[in-house]
Amino acid sequence: MSQQYEKKVERTEVVYGGDRRVEGSASASAEKTTNYTHTEIRAPMVNPLPPIISTGAAGLAQEIVGEGFTASATRISGAAATTQVLESQASREQAFKDQEKYSREQAAIARAHDKDLEKKTEEYRKTAEAEAEKIRKELEKQHARDVEFRKDLVESAIDRQKREVDLEAKYAKKELEHERELAMNALEQSKMATNVQVQMDTAAGTTVSGGTTVSEHTEVHDGKEKKSLGEKIKSLF
């Protein structure tokens, strides 16, 4: 029994495409991708027969199903192309302008930084000079205070020496006065003894008297070593 088959072809195609250009570059690329699905189906053609009563398994159902069907499906993808494009004059000019603009902006940033650095340096210099001037004035004041302090020390030492000299001279004068009084007392005592003796002699006239002449001498010792005024003044220096 010959069978006839019906062939059906289904094709689905999807196309992706795009064009990309790099700014400032000397090349451009274009890419196109095509995907499609191809399906072939062969199914047996059914020729309905007149109704036949049959008890077997063969029949219309076997013709439809029993022989089965054949199908093939294939998915194909791919195809990409890259095209090199030369840089145009406008693109080169734009790239040159961008490079010049970049150089100008970079130089402006450097100038701004140098100006800011110069300003901060000047402010720091002024502050440092002001602080140095303040310190210098304080040092000058301190030096003046040191000079006055040393002057006061010298004057105080000189005043002390002067007062000590005056004190020594005062007590040396008192010592001299005391020694003078002692000497005068001794002389008075010696003179009285001589006068008694003379008066005894005058009582006899030319007659040898049997009287005795008594001479008295008084020495006073106070137990201290005596120094002259000159030696005392020299000892102060």
From Swiss-Prot:
Family: Belongs to the Cytosolic-abundant heat soluble protein (CAHS) family.
Organism ancestry: Eukaryota, Metazoa, Ecdysozoa, Tardigrada, Eutardigrada
Induction: Expression is highly induced during desiccation.
Localization (cell): Cytoplasm
Region CAHS motif 1, residue ranges: 124-142
Disulfide bridge map: none
Compositional bias (Basic and acidic residues): 111-125, 216-237
Region (CAHS motif 2): 161-179
Protein name in UniProt: Cytosolic-abundant heat soluble protein 86272
Keywords, alphabetical: Coiled coil, Cytoplasm, Repeat, Stress response
Domain of life where this protein originates: Eukaryota
GO CC aspect terms: cytoplasm
UniProt function note: CAHS proteins are cytosolic heat soluble proteins that seem to contribute to the anhydrobiosis in tardigrades, but their specific mechanisms are yet to be identified. It is possible that protection during anhydrobiosis might occur via the stabilization of vitrifying small molecules such as sugars, but not via the direct glass transition of CAHS proteins themselves.
Gene Ontology BP annotations: response to desiccation
Phenotype of null mutants: Affects slightly survival under dry conditions but does not affect survival under frozen conditions.
Stretches with biased composition (Low complexity): 204-215
Additional facts recorded: Trehalose, a disaccharide essential for several organisms to survive drying, is detected at low levels or not at all in some tardigrade species, indicating that tardigrades possess potentially novel mechanisms for surviving desiccation involving tardigrade-specific intrinsically disordered proteins (TDPs).
Domain text: CAHS proteins contain 2 repeats of 19-mer peptides designated as CAHS-motifs that comprise each two octapeptides connected by a tripeptide.
Main location: cytoplasm
Region of interest: Disordered: 96-125, 204-237
Gene: CAHS 86272
Any coiled-coil regions, as ranges: 115-193
Gene source species: Hypsibius exemplaris (Freshwater tardigrade)
